[in-house]
Swiss-Prot record:
Domain PWI: 27-126
GO BP annotation list: mRNA processing; regulation of mRNA splicing, via spliceosome; RNA splicing
Keyword Cytoplasm part of the UniProt annotation: no
Listed GO MF terms: RNA binding
UniProt-recorded name of the protein: Serine/arginine repetitive matrix protein 1
Length: 888
């Protein structure tokens, strides 16, 4: 009964045991190609796997390693069963997708086994297409790169052409823009300073000068005849400037340039003497002096850039006689403007004080001289202080020494001499001497010879004037400098350059001492100080905008370091860097420091300066832009000033980045000060970033202003070594500064050389300190309606304190001075670290500098030659190191 139930169906009949694959094979639809067998040994599976992975991922929508590996494993067999593969894949991919997948995969395998390489022809075609596409893409990329490169090349060429144009044309543009505008604007500033509507005009002229040399030319157009001459001289100078800009990069070429500088100095002295004769008449007409000073500013800048010395000799003779143009040219914008105005004022004072010396250059501004002359007795203090207050003067002094007539003026008028020195020293010595010291390497074109000159003069002149000055009062030194000036002008700009240098060192030592003394006297007699410091520095810089010139002049010694930095820049952009040099002694300072120290940054600026000159040129062009715009022109002037002033700021910025921006910004703040007639308005224009810069840059100028802008700036100048000292002997910022100042003072010859090394970093650090401490001062001045005056008053009070400190520090500085001389080499390596200490040490260094400089007046003269040699070597080493590392 039950038998049938269990026997009813066989296993085959029971679907539970049926061969399901057979059923599926019968039921499923397969692509026709699957009928063909594939020999996997002939197939390059590695080429197929990427396609399988891609396809499965497309089907599933995600990358399933299990499925992919399952497929790979099935294909590992020599002769895989295509239908079974499809059946097996149906569970992972649905039936339709599995069929499609196998329909695509199998033809690939079939073509691959037919191909020798085992690669499907489709893949080969795809590869070919891909290769073609890649080639096309590469070609496109290459063409794009080429286009980019071409564009870059074009841009570079355009920039080079522009730079060349700026150099050739803009020996006018730059020299016109920066120097000429400065000079023109400086003459304008003279008028404006006089009228106190100078700043607006200054801006206008700055703009016009900056927007186009045409405007500058238009400004000087009143003296088109002078311009042609200037053009000739400027062209010659531009040639020399252009060469020097490049040559300023190599120290050796600079020395070569020096000889041309001397020759060109003589020629320019002749030309400038001619222009002096004109300038007296033109000094009568400010427009003439403006156009002249602008025109001279161009030639002078070329002269400067060519041979800052030659310009300085010329400037010395001519700036004295043509003081407004010349000094103004030295202050190219700020200095020249302010300095000329100031110079005119002071030269007026000087004229009154000594009409003979100021008569030629001061006769233009005899009226202003009386005011300065009022300070004339203080100016004598200023004269001494002009040593201290005129670190720029010191440079100017050295530079005026080249021009005997100017020196007589100086001698007649301490202020005039100081101012002349400031403007000139800062212009010419600042550029020549400071460049000599600091840019001896970078500036060596003017500076190398100047350094040798200074060394020579430091031997002859320092022996003469140094000992005399050390033994005698500043007047002997001045007379000695006069003699040296005359002899230098007689012997040529070479002796004047030499005199500049020794005088500078003497001036640094003696004058700084005297400056300190005068700063003492100034601080004791705020009116003299304010007159010279505040009026001359401040008025130049800030209130009259001549004080800025003065400050810039006073900074000019420090700016010469900056010049160093911008020797090529100053040379190329010497117009703008000269302002830097002039206006920001701190800036110059720090720039010089950078130049010296980071000859690389400075070289970047200066030696690297050929490129940085573009930057500076760019900066000049920006400056030009600034000039173009009222606030930009202020910025430009201010920025040159700021660059000079903010050398500290700029030095910090430049340390980090020689960014022309910081320079510009700093420039613009200085410009604020420069446009002291409306410095604050400009401050507002330039002050957006420059207000801080203004605090920093203005601070440094104010510091200069406040400490006796010229005195402190110069101290900074000589402190440039001091910051090194500060680093080397950071016993205290003050002691460091004392040491630094003693080094810079007693080692002023030494600092002069060391300024190559030490000043670069000290300048930077000092500049930062100038930035910081001046920034503090500048803050109050900036906040106060008359920041310059406040800073001057503060500077007066601080100077008094510093003078006291200086007295105490003298002994320390003397000791430290010797130590620092040894340390300077080591300190040169620590410019950055010195920067912080320099903030405090910058003030104290200034204080200390006066003492050591006074003390070192006699000592440094003997040691100046040796010190200068050592310092030059150190500076060259530091510059080379900086050139090697910072540019990279």
């Amino acid at each position: 009964m039950d038998a049938g139930f269990f026997r009813g169906t066989s296993a085959e009949q029971d679907n539970r045991f049926s061969n399901k694959q057979k059923k599926l094979l019968k039921q499923l639809k397969f692509a026709e190609c699957l009928e063909k067998k594939v020999d996997m040994s002939k197939v390059n599976l590695e080429v197929i796997k990427p396609w399988i992975t891609k396809r499965v991922t497309e089907i599933l929508g995600f990358e399933d390693d299990v499925v992919i590996e399952f497929i790979f494993n099935q294909l590992e067999v020599k002769n895989p069963d295509s239908k079974m593969m499809q059946i097996n894949l149906t569970g992972f991919l649905n039936g339709k997708n599995a069929r499609e997948f196998m329909g695509e995969l199998w033809p690939l395998l079939l073509s691959a086994q037919e191909n020798i390489a085992g690669i499907p022809t489709a893949f080969l075609e795809l590869k070919k297409e891909e290769i073609k596409q890649r080639q096309i893409e590469q070609e496109k990329l290459a063409s794009m790169k080429k286009q980019d490169e071409d564009k870059e090349k074009r841009d570079k060429e355009d920039k080079d052409n522009r730079e060349k144009r700026d150099r050739s044309r803009s020996p006018r543009r730059r020299k016109s823009r920066s120097p000429s505008p400065r000079r023109r604007s400086s003459p304008i500033r003279r008028e404006r300073k006089r009228s106190h509507s100078r700043s607006p005009h200054h801006r206008t002229k700055s703009r016009s000068a900056t927007p186009a040399p045409e405007k500058k030319e238009a400004t000087p157009e009143p003296e088109p005849s002078v311009k042609p001459k200037e053009t000739v001289v400027q062209e010659a100078t531009s040639n020399s400037d252009i060469p020097k800009a490049p040559k300023s990069e190599p120290p050796v070429p600079e020395t070569k340039e020096i000889s041309p500088e001397r020759n060109s100095k003589k020629e320019r002295e002749k030309e400038k003497e001619k222009t002096r004769q004109r300038s007296p008449t033109r000094s009568k007409s400010r427009s003439r002096s403006r156009s002249r000073s602008p025109s001279h500013s161009r030639p002078r800048r070329r002269h400067r850039s060519r041979s800052r010395r030659r310009p300085s000799p010329r400037r010395r003779p001519s700036p004295r006689r043509r003081t407004p143009p010349r000094r103004m040219p030295p202050p190219p914008r700020h200095r020249r403007s302010r300095s000329p105005v100031r110079r005119r004022r002071r030269s007026s004072a000087s004229l009154s004080g000594s009409s003979s010396s100021s008569s030629s250059s001061r006769s233009r501004s005899p009226p202003k001289k009386p005011p300065k002359r009022t300070v004339s007795s203080p100016p004598r203090k200023t004269r001494r202080l002009s040593p201290s207050a005129s670190p720029p003067r010191r440079r100017h002094r050295p530079s005026p020494p080249a021009s005997p007539p100017p020196k007589p003026r100086r001698s007649p008028t301490p202020q005039q001499s100081n101012r002349a020195r400031k403007s000139r020293g800062s212009v010419s010595p600042g550029r020549a001497s400071a460049p000599k010291h600091k840019s001896t390497e970078k500036r060596e074109s003017p500076s190398p010879a100047p350094k040798p000159r200074k060394a020579e003069l430091s031997e002859s002149e320092e022996d003469k004037g140094g000992k005399m000055a050390a033994a005698d009062s500043v007047q002997q030194r001045r007379q000695y400098r006069r003699q040296n000036q005359q002899s230098s002008s007689d012997s040529g700009s070479s002796s004047s350059s030499e005199e500049e240098r020794p005088k500078r060192s003497n001036v640094k030592n003696g004058e700084v001492g005297r400056r300190r003394r005068h700063s003492h006297s100034r601080s004791p007699s705020p009116s003299p100080r304010k007159r010279q410091k505040e009026p001359s520095p401040r008025r130049r810089r800030r209130s009259p905008s001549p004080p800025p010139a003065r400050r810039r002049r006073s900074p000019s010694p420090p700016p010469p370091p900056r010049r160093r930095r911008s020797p090529s820049l100053p040379r190329r952009r010497s117009p703008s860097p000269p302002p830097r040099r002039r206006s920001p002694s701190p800036r110059r300072y720090s720039p010089p420091i950078q130049r010296r120290y980071s000859p690389s940054p400075p070289p970047k600026r200066r030696t690297a300066s050929p490129p940085p000159p573009p930057k500076r040129r760019a900066s000049p062009s920006p400056q030009s832009k600034r000039r173009v715009s009222h606030s930009p022109p202020p910025k430009q002037r201010s920025s040159p000033a700021a660059k000079r002033r903010s050398p500290s700021i700029s030095s910090k910025h430049r340390k980090g980045s020689p960014p022309s921006r910081s320079n510009r910004e700093t420039r613009s703040p200085p410009q604020n000060k420069r446009d002291s007639p409306s410095p604050r308005p400009r401050a507002s224009h330039t002050s957006s970033s420059p207000p801080p810069l203004r605090r920093g840059a203005s601070a440094s100028p104010q510091r200069r202003q406040s400490p006796s802008p010229s005195t402190r700036p110069i101290r900074r100048v000589s402190r440039t070594p001091e910051p090194k000292k500060t680093k080397a002997s950071t016993p205290s910022p003050r002691s460091a500064r004392r040491v630094s100042s003693s080094r810079s003072a007693s080692g002023s010859p030494e600092p002069a050389p060391k300024k190559h090394q030490g000043p670069p970093s000290p300048a930077r650090s000092r500049s930062p300190s100038a930035n910081w401490s001046p920034a503090k001062k500048a803050k109050s001045p900036t906040q106060s309606p008359s920041p310059a005056r406040n800073s001057d008053q503060e500077g007066g009070g601080k100077k008094k304190k510093k003078k006291k400190d200086k007295k105490h520090k003298k002994d320390k500085k003397h000791k430290k001075h010797k130590k620092h001389k040894k340390e300077k080499a080591a300190v040169a390596a620590a410019p950055a670290a010195v920067a912080a200490a320099d903030t405090t040490s910058a003030q104290e260094e200034q204080e200390a500098e006066t003492e050591p400089k006074k003390e070192t007046e006699s000592e440094p003269e003997d040691n100046l030659d040796d010190l200068e040699k050592h310092l030059r070597e150190k500076a060259l080493r530091s510059m080379r190191k900086a050139q090697v590392s910072p540019p990279s």
